[in-house]
């Protein structure tokens, strides 16, 4: 699978696909840098006036509801409608779904047309139980708790989507295929925007791989392997963030193999 990952990255860096981001303001800078490091070309637009034209230019669309307000909701809804009309993959991160009524409602609306969805266990569980409350962006459940809901959601999605449940162990399903990924490092939970950027990596991989399940699996593995390599070089989360960008850019598969093959 490392060879397939390497092929996807080569395509990314050759084609430099444009990824349109309707995303939160907290992690926008780090997210854009992650895109650049792996070879994608991010557009971080906040204007409705250029939305349709930018979607035409884009190979994939990424929506992240981290900083939610009424203007963002309108733009996110219009983004997904235009993307579906133009047959562009929609990658969705339902940040803090289940924490508030509005986040849960917006997430349900966007989920229906998503190509890939990534959330923590509590966020994914909120799609199966509208009465369940989460604790903001932090998960109060394990990946194992969300497997059945994730599988059911993937089967129900209109676009045949892949669902990724992030945690100490990641779970990926498209309703038919299932896999787990046990990679990464605890430092990843100490950097704001790490999950947002992981979902962005899915968007980049999906722009060059038509199979959403495979794109999601490769994206998780690449991002978490780079996290493990970054951890070798630092003792705290501040430098970890910088070294992660370096590793995303370097693509040192010889060093990755020690973790991938163990």
Swiss-Prot record:
- GO terms of biological process kind: thiamine biosynthetic process; thiamine diphosphate biosynthetic process
Q: Name one GO molecular function term.
A: ATP binding
Q: Which cofactor does it need?
A: Mg(2+)
List the catalytic activities from the record: 5-(2-hydroxyethyl)-4-methylthiazole + ATP = 4-methyl-5-(2-phosphooxyethyl)-thiazole + ADP + H(+)
Which InterPro entries did the record assign? Hyethyz_kinase, Ribokinase-like
| Enzyme Commission no | 2.7.1.50
Asked if Nuclease is a keyword of the record, the answer is no
The organism's superkingdom is given as Bacteria
Residues binding ATP are 118, 166
Give the residues the record marks as binding substrate.
44, 193
Which pathway, per its entry?
Cofactor biosynthesis; thiamine diphosphate biosynthesis; 4-methyl-5-(2-phosphoethyl)-thiazole from 5-(2-hydroxyethyl)-4-methylthiazole: step 1/1
Q: What keywords does the record list, in alphabetical order?
A: ATP-binding, Kinase, Magnesium, Metal-binding, Nucleotide-binding, Thiamine biosynthesis, Transferase
Q: Which family does it belong to?
A: Belongs to the Thz kinase family.
Q: What does this protein do?
A: Catalyzes the phosphorylation of the hydroxyl group of 4-methyl-5-beta-hydroxyethylthiazole (THZ).
User: What is the recorded name of this protein?
Assistant: Hydroxyethylthiazole kinase
Q: Which organism is it from?
A: Chlamydia abortus (strain DSM 27085 / S26/3) (Chlamydophila abortus)
Q: Which gene encodes it?
A: thiM
């Amino acid at each position: 699978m490392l060879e397939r990952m390497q092929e996807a990255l080569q395509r990314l860096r050759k084609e430099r696909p444009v990824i349109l981001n309707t995303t939160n303001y907290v992690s926008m800078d780090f997210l854009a840098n992650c895109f650049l490091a792996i070879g994608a070309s991010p557009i971080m637009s906040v204007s409705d006036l250029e939305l349709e034209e930018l979607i035409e230019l884009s190979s994939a669309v990424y929506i992240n509801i981290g900083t939610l307000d009424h203007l963002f909701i309108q733009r996110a809804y219009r983004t997904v409608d235009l993307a579906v009309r133009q047959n562009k993959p929609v990658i969705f991160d339902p940040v803090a779904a289940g924490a508030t009524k509005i986040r849960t409602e917006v997430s349900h609306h966007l989920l229906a047309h998503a190509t890939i969805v990534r959330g923590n266990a509590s966020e994914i569980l909120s799609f199966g139980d509208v009465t369940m409350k989460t604790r903001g962006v932090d998960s109060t459940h394990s990946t194992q708790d969300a497997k059945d809901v994730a599988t059911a959601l993937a089967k129900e999605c209109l676009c045949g989507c892949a669902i990724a449940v992030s945690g100490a162990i990641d779970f990926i399903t498209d309703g038919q295929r299932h896999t787990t990924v046990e990679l990464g490092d605890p430092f990843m939970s100490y950097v704001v925007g790490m999950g947002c950027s992981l979902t962005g990596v899915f968007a980049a991989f999906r722009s060059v791989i038509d199979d959403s399940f495979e794109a999601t699996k490769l994206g998780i593995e690449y991002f978490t392997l780079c996290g493990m390599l970054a951890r070798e070089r630092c003792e705290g989360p501040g430098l970890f963030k910088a070294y992660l960008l370096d590793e995303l850019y370097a693509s040192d598969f010889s060093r990755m193999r020690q973790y991938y093959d163990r």
